Amino acid sequence: MGTVSSRRLWWPLPLLLLLLLGPTGTRAQEEDDDDYEELVLALRSEEDGLVDALQHGATATFHRCAKDSWRLPGTYVVVLKEETHRSQPERTARRLQAQAARRGYLIKLLHVFHDLLPGFLVKMSRDLLELALRLPHVDYIEEDSSVFAQSIPWNLERITPARYRADEYQPPNGGSLVEVYLLDTSIQSGHREIEGRVMVTDFGSVPEEDGTRFHRQASKCDSHGTHLAGVVSGRDAGVAKGASLRSLRVLNCQGKGTVSSTLIGLEFIRKSQLVQPVGPLVVLLPLAGGYSRVLNAACQRLARAGVVLVAAAGNFRDDACLYSPASAPEVITVGATNAQDQPVTLGTLGTNFGRCVDLFAPGEDIIGASSDCSTCFVSRSGTSQAAAHVAGIAAMMLSAKPELTLAELRQRLIHFSAKDVINEAWFPEDQRVLTPNLVAALPPSTHGAGWQLFCRTVWSAHSGPTRMATAMARCAPDEELLSCSSFSRSGRRRGERIEAQGGRRVCLAHNAFGGEGVYAIARCCLLPQANCSVHTAPPAGAGMGTRAHCHQQGHILTGCSSHWEVEDLGTHKPPVLRPGGQHDQCMGHRGASTHASCCHAPGLECKVKEHGLPAPQEQVTVTCEEGWTLTGCSALPGTSHILGAYAVDDTCVVRSRDVSTTSSTSEETVATVAICCRSQHLAQASQELQ
């Protein structure tokens, strides 16, 4: 925690105006928010008009990497507000240089961003941060930091569907319609694995190597990039053997780069896309650094422009949400497994995990091109290799269906993955329920499954422990939020609900007094032409409980949720499992508001499946039949010991407190409600295309 002294100004206003070019005091406050540190600088003055005169009404923020040793003080990315004019970055940079010069400081302008985000990169003294943060149009400033390569033939067999396996890897197509951009070290483009398949661009933005005695050898400088290029599209050991690669050098010979160089590389891709639009683009980011707001924002901008980004989860045996670009929601984040489908261990470290990981892929002892010679091969391990596998699979899927959106591609990658094959005991206990048990695999047919209703589960960050703390989970813009649930390890929660925020529906979960925090869990689905709404029944106060219905004609129940204001609902009468004709309603505790999520979409049909067991039960599950997709997962009110409900693939899981600490009555029941849906419209459309 650091502070900067603040001085009150008592001189007359005319004299103050003469002194405006002199240093002005501020007060700074640093807060460590786990993911990053934020420094908020605001101008303080006795003269109310002084702030307006300087146009310093808005407060900008300063961010830096949470890991001390990764910080690069003296280099800063200045990000302007989104609505600023295209010419504003240069004007703001010139203004900053001029004001710094009057104070005896020199500022070196390293790069101006236009096409990715409005801003610029500067090299300057930390003493000028106060000045920069007070400039008009500045949204935030981030100190530069380091990023690192994430690398420390069973792999091709593993991603091939079982019924297609043979002695030779035979993918459905080569990914020839897709360009893959690789942001990495330099590449030995003459290696026979990738010769003629890789275009080495003239882009290069890398820091100097550490150590004065470091000897640059071509084989060392090209090592990481050459291996990954071979994994993506190598002739013998590649996943997508027909995909073309473009190499951008953002890592030095030691496999080290910076956030700023990665940003400049991403902007290079965006500029190329604008100048010469081509087919589908995949960007492979086999690197990781500390959490970076600006790097995540850049990934978001590029994804919204139609680019698919695939990133390494990181090799730190840690929560991937603490690293970038792995933590960016728009990025497909990949962890690493070995030949036995177990998480990769790398000495004392290993693959990252957690809710920010989308899936895992082969990442141990991966055979690929070696930069030692043009015919050499080498074995490498890490989440970089895992991400390269998924980039290759994505290239093949996009070659088969170039019109796939990022949301559609991600849903297909999840749907066709091998499920429940990873030993979850490897992960920390608090991360097991959050980490997807999925290993990437090619679909049996890249043209098939057009009839399938695709859904995925999105977990929020953990809320704080305060009584009014909330957690929020949201779907991608192209996805529909069909249901919302919540989970608390302590069981102290106040339920969940769907709410509209900024024109989008989000899933909110509420912590309770004495609770340790909650998670919100959104069920996000691809449902074209859907019209969805939520119908709420207020607390009944008496009787069996509350019931919420789908009132609009043609609307079908896709999910149930409930929330309450009291701290403890107490024990409820045993739930009554509904007969077949009453599956258009949600049932809740009489003291809770109950919400029915209802949707109208062409050909949509849904059914409710319920299963109850006498308490205590650690968990009760219900699974949808093949051909049906789980859209809603909730618990019927039958016991006060419910921890929450969440979806794992097409299985609804309701958890209750540990039986050893539970004192339940013989009347209490743990009951799970699964809503399973399918789309006849999608099935018909798929048949027409075939």
UniProtKB/Swiss-Prot annotation:
PTM: Cleavage by furin and PCSK5 generates a truncated inactive protein that is unable to induce LDLR degradation.
Signal peptide feature range: 1-28
Residue numbers of Phosphoserine PTMs: 45, 686
Modified residues (Sulfotyrosine): 36
GO molecular function: apolipoprotein binding; low-density lipoprotein particle binding; serine-type endopeptidase activity; very-low-density lipoprotein particle binding
Entry's Gene Ontology BP terms: apoptotic process; cholesterol metabolic process; low-density lipoprotein particle receptor catabolic process; proteolysis; regulation of neuron apoptotic process
This protein's record includes keyword Hydrolase: yes
EC number from the UniProt entry: 3.4.21.-
Any single Pfam family the record assigns to this protein: Inhibitor_I9
Cofactor(s) needed for function: Ca(2+)
Marked site: Cleavage: 150-151, 216-217
Keywords per UniProt: Apoptosis, Autocatalytic cleavage, Calcium, Cholesterol metabolism, Cytoplasm, Disulfide bond, Endoplasmic reticulum, Endosome, Glycoprotein, Golgi apparatus, Hydrolase, Lipid metabolism, Lysosome, Phosphoprotein, Protease, Secreted, Serine protease, Signal, Steroid metabolism, Sterol metabolism, Sulfation, Zymogen
Activity regulation behaviour: Its proteolytic activity is autoinhibited by the non-covalent binding of the propeptide to the catalytic domain. Inhibited by EGTA.
Domain Inhibitor I9: 75-147
Cross-referenced CDD domains: PCSK9_C-CRD, Peptidases_S8_PCSK9_ProteinaseK_like
Keyword Magnesium included in the entry's annotation: no
Chain spans, region C-terminal domain: 448-690
Catalytic residues in the record: 184 (charge relay system), 224 (charge relay system), 384 (charge relay system)
GO CC annotation, single: extracellular space
Xref: InterPro entries: PCSK9_C1, PCSK9_C2, PCSK9_C3, PCSK9_ProteinaseK-like, Peptidase_S8/S53_dom, Peptidase_S8/S53_dom_sf, Peptidase_S8_subtilisin-like, Peptidase_S8_subtilisin-rel
Function: Crucial player in the regulation of plasma cholesterol homeostasis. Binds to low-density lipid receptor family members: low density lipoprotein receptor (LDLR), very low density lipoprotein receptor (VLDLR), apolipoprotein E receptor (LRP1/APOER) and apolipoprotein receptor 2 (LRP8/APOER2), and promotes their degradation in intracellular acidic compartments. Acts via a non-proteolytic mechanism to enhance the degradation of the hepatic LDLR through a clathrin LDLRAP1/ARH-mediated pathway.
UniProt remark on domains: The C-terminal domain (CRD) is essential for the LDLR-binding and degrading activities. The catalytic domain is responsible for mediating its self-association.
Family: Belongs to the peptidase S8 family.
Subunit (UniProt): Monomer. Can self-associate to form dimers and higher multimers which may have increased LDLR degrading activity. The precursor protein but not the mature protein may form multimers. Interacts with APOB, VLDLR, LRP8/APOER2 and BACE1. The full-length immature form (pro-PCSK9) interacts with SCNN1A, SCNN1B and SCNN1G. The pro-PCSK9 form (via C-terminal domain) interacts with LDLR. Interacts (via the C-terminal domain) with ANXA2 (via repeat Annexin 1); the interaction inhibits the degradation of LDLR.
UniProt protein name: Proprotein convertase subtilisin/kexin type 9
Gene name linked to the record: PCSK9
